[in-house]
Amino acid sequence: MADVFISHSSADLQFAQFLQRHLYGESVSAFLAPVSLSPGEHWPQEILSALSSSDWVLFLASRSACASPWVQQELGAALIAKKKLVPIVWDMPPSELPGWVGHYQALNLAGASTAEIQAQIAAIAGRIKSDKAKGLLIAGLLVAGLFAFGSKG
């Protein structure tokens, strides 16, 4: 199970791979279909499975991604499942995001240097790891509570 699902247009694969590499460098696992899927896998099913098991969706919101029916389906599923969604823009202003994602605060990387982009990726990775740690703590407390409750009987 990946921590993050990267939704992107195939035209943006190079940037998606850059993002995935830097997330891995920050100890955050990321599903990226062209890299994460093995030959012979039924990719629509695997993509939906990866999306449903990831808590976060990073949407590489380029003009081509916003026009892609596949990306729209992925984001529709993410919105319905109430995933934590971060639109990342670089080739258009956030104000041009489609209405179905325009109300999410976007990360605007237009004109950012490689070092600035890496710093922003590290910041997002920190949020994801913090969120994951909170979830693990809650799960641990629930298990401990169930164990304590069960041992009283």
Task: Please place each PLM-identified region on the residue numbering.
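Redox-cofactor binding/interface segments in oxidoreductases and associated redox assembly factors
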Residues: F59
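Glycine-rich, charge-decorated loop segments at or immediately adjacent to ligand/cofactor-binding or catalytic sites
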Residues: P93-Y104
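Loop/helix-junction capping segments adjacent to catalytic residues or to phosphate/diphosphate-binding pockets
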Residues: L13-Q14, G40-E41, A65-P69, T114-A115
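Conserved beta-strand/loop subsegment of P-loop NTPase cores
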Residues: L85-W90
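Juxtamembrane amphipathic/hinge helix adjacent to a transmembrane helix
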Residues: G102-K129
